[in-house]
Amino acid sequence: MRIICLSTPVGPLGSGLGGGVELTLRTLVRGLSTLGHTVTVVAPVGSHVAPMTTIERVGGALHVPSQTLDRSTPPVVPDDSVLVNMWRRVTEMSRSGNFDIVLNFAYDALPFVSSQECAIPVAHLVSMGSLSDEMDRAVATAVYRSSRCVAMHSHAQARSFGPEIAGRVTVVASGIDLSAYDYIEAPDTSLAFVARISREKGVRDAFAVATLTGRVLNAFGVMEDRSVWDDAAREFPNATVEYRGFLTTDVLQRELGRSAALIMVHHWVEAFGNVAIEALACGVPVITYDRGGPAEIVHHGRTGFVVPPDDVSAVAGAVDRLGTIQRRDCRSVVEDRYSEQAFAGRVAAWLAAVGR
């Protein structure tokens, strides 16, 4: 297949502003190319991709991330929108005769409701759960137009859009390039928190866990909302939490791999949680709230622990049981199900079905 990948409009690839969708897109570009497909990426100006990747960089104003808006807040399309400009370029490319399908990564209504403007099929890989009334309507529009055209990363994510939508979408999970992650058998005692520094990611809960366990917590990710960090630091003055910034995959995996555990204390429905499989690939157990995709990834008692949502004491209690986890089992789970090749294979099969 000759595939056009439409990137997220919230930031350039490589900036970290797009969150997990950036890793997903990079992984699929490599994986699909390895399977013999031709991939062209359409992304905002300033995007960085792997060498030999064909990319069209498009200018325009970036969009506000959907997770920062209230559910009923109408989205604001900025003047000279980068998404509008990227979509215009995608529709032009679709008429060239050089492509077979569009793979949309943008969590925005435009590609979902305007897919008929393209001369080739459009497939949508939804990166987040239900966050707004408009996106719910947009996803429903696409699903009812073509029941095969929407895929999601987890069953929990699909259920967030309601049972009818959940029954009509394809679940493809996710994957990573295992060669980029070193397995580390002997960790130190620190905990890791890897996420955008924002309210829905549970920054306050992370500080609370650091206080309860008395362990050092290293936080990695884009500083999206400094006030959330400052509020948590004031509330938990005895927490030893070190902000390590947004790191490249190579540096992050080395730092993450030394951790005793990754904690995932999110307050929203994580669509999947790529960082969970990144941690597991390094041999790091994952302690997660039973909310969203991460709870489907973690094998409770084998690769980590799944605890009740919003229960920081349960997270701290799970830290005390980390000695029961064999780190090699964590790596094995990723090798079996979440490799780049396995993920690309699932997505390629789905795209072939959409294109029929």
Tell where the protein language model's regions lie, with residue ranges.
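Catalytic cores of nucleotide-sugar-dependent glycosyltransferases that transfer UDP/GDP/TDP-activated
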Residues: M1-R356
